[in-house]
Design a protein with these regions (language model features):
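N-terminal export/assembly segments and adjacent metallocofactor-ligating motifs
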Residues: 1, 13-225
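Structured interaction patches on ligand/partner-binding surfaces of diverse proteins
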Residues: 5-11
Length: 225
């Protein structure tokens, strides 16, 4: 029988087939159903997201099924953009907020086809108790949650890095390791790195507090007396 690999417990002597025609057809159907509720790839929050990369591998770009009703873009937060039109209800953001950062701001609400991710009591993100750690952004596979600095007015990503640099957060003494995404020698965004102190996690300062780099009072060369 077919079963999701994430819930099937292995047992001794089990034989697993992942590339049978039945399994591949089932995966394609799942992606086609998910694509039906997505904006087109060109208008999605992140055309280069994990979701669209996997969709391309599965050979699924369009769907024969009707889509859900469009959900308006939420730009109420200064640092993050919310486009639930691209959400696939995977619950990764919920778990990132609740289990990884233990903030418990994000949850699932409503039932059936109306089920969706909410902040607190279905408040706009910018009016919720969100502490802006950005763990949900790092976990999201579709771009439904994105750094505001990366998207245009329509909520589509337009800024991509040309290289990444491993670094350490300069604020407190914890020593959180970071992965800095750079374009034209300017920082676009920062992700958490799997270091011993932070294990991929960051706080609001580590993820979004890099504007000091452009401050006119910052020393960029050694001072010699």
């Amino acid at each position: 029988t077919l079963a999701a690999s994430c819930i099937r417990k292995p047992t001794e002597g089990m034989e697993v087939t992942v590339n049978s025609s039945r399994a591949e057809k089932s995966r394609s159907m799942v992606f086609e159903l998910l694509v039906s509720d997505q904006p087109s790839k060109e208008q999605s929050p992140d055309p280069d997201s994990k979701f669209w990369n996997w969709s391309e591998k599965m050979g699924v770009s369009t769907s024969r099924f009707p889509g859900k009703e469009k959900i308006n873009l939420d730009r109420s937060h200064k640092a993050m953009s919310v486009n639930l039109d691209a959400c696939i209800n995977c619950n990764l953001c919920v778990r990132a907020c609740r289990e990884v950062q233990v903030n418990d701001v994000i949850g699932m609400a409503y039932r059936g086809s109306t089920a969706k991710v909410i902040f607190d009591l279905d408040d706009p993100m910018g009016e919720s108790t969100c502490v802006a750690c950005g763990e949900c952004v790092q976990a999201c596979p579709t771009g439904a949650l994105m750094e505001s600095s990366l998207v245009n007015e329509e909520g589509t990503r337009v800024n991509y890095s040309d290289r990444t640099v491993d670094s350490v957060c300069p604020y407190c003494g914890v020593g959180c390791q970071t992965k800095v995404h750079v374009k034209d020698d300017k920082i676009l965004y920062v992700d958490g790195k799997d270091g011993p102190a932070n294990e991929n996690r960051l706080c609001v300062k580590g993820r979004f507090g890099f504007d000091y780099i452009k401050h006119e009072g910052r020393l960029t060369k050694p001072l010699i007396r």
